Amino acid sequence: MFASFLYFDLSFMVWYLLGPLQVPIAQALGLDTQQRALMVAVPILCGAVLRLVLGMLADRIGAKRAGVVAQLAVIASLFGAWQLGVHSMGQVLLLGVLLGIAGASFAVALPLASRWYPPEHQGTAMGIAGAGNSGTVLAALFAPMLALAFGYQNVFGLACIPLVLTLLVFVLIAREAPIPVARKRWADYGRVLVGNRDAWRFMFFYSVTFGGFSGFASALPGYFHDQFGFDARTAGWATAACVLAGSVMRPLGGVIADRVGGTRALLAVYLLVATLVGIAGFGAGGATITLGLFVLTLLCLGGGNGAVFQLVPQRFGQDIGVMTGLIGMAGGIGGFALAAGLGVLKQHTGSYAIGMWLFAAFALGGWALLAGVKTQWRSEWSTAGAARV
């Protein structure tokens, strides 16, 4: 469990690295709002797609070995960026693609942890391992300060230090669960998706919760800079407060879902998120109130992430590996759409409001979709195990 958490934590830190560095990078390279948004969104999208690939690799060579390979690739990418420099939009996007490998750590950390625990504790186990997304807090807190002190180029080199240490710990203490793991093929993903409405529902649910978390985590430094004139360091601190709330709440969301049922927890999350983001879209009340709204928003989204993965093992017991990859991919695509969409709409409308209201509408859509199937799920799954639906 600890190895999964630590691996996930540091992977998320570097996956998110361009988010808190977006202000100094954009100033140095002369990027507009739309380009800046694309810069922070590309790692999210690439991480989403690569999760399927890394998940299949983990089934063939083991989650631990796959994690080691991925971590080495990320370290090499950051070292190369540090030595060669990042001096153009094209180079930033290339680095974003390579940092997407770190985002694919989802497909290693969660199965590595979850296979050790029975169904009634899946929400707690997945929540604790998934709390590794708190690595975004580390990036938001320290990356802007390090960029101010040493330049953003050197931040890439400095990031290699904790990654190397984490890799050593992971190699020494990570253990595979003593259970057989079926190898996934591309056909397995198609089999789960074709004619299976629940698979698509869960992908949509997670595209809202994790997509909202990752998208806002990447977009908020630029948002606070544009809306309230925060410098990179202050914007990073404000974002860190939001992300910390969501990261702490993820394991708590799993615990709450274990106790009250994942559907009840998730329904509450969607209503709260839609309300909070809808209010934030009006931009009234100044920086303090807006920051408070986003702290509460990411807190709810973090809890929603835990609730989703309390439900997934109940519905897809034997296909948990396949569904983890698909749902994780959907979450990443949702995060890409949110981060990029906010920037594009800001560039062309002069305001973040429309993007936020659209996201609030998607959250309401998640509530309506879940409300329509909750009774059926509770009746069908209630005899399948001890976990609450």
What is the predicted role of each segment?
Residues 261-308:
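C-terminal transmembrane helical hairpin of 12-TM major facilitator-type secondary transporters
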Residues 95-132:
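Cytoplasmic helix-loop-helix junction between adjacent transmembrane helices
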Residues 64-67, 266:
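Primarily marks hydrophobic transmembrane alpha-helices of the MFS/SLC 12-helix fold
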Residues 18-22, 197-251:
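Extracytoplasmic gate region of multi-pass secondary transporters
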Residues 128-174:
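Helix-loop-helix hairpin linking two adjacent transmembrane segments in secondary transporters
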Residues 72-86, 272-285:
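C-terminal ends and interior cores of transmembrane alpha-helices
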Residues 175-203, 389:
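Juxtamembrane intracellular "pre-TM" segments in multi-pass secondary transporters
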Residues 154-171, 354-372:
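Symmetry-related core transmembrane helices of the 12-TM Major Facilitator Superfamily/SLC fold
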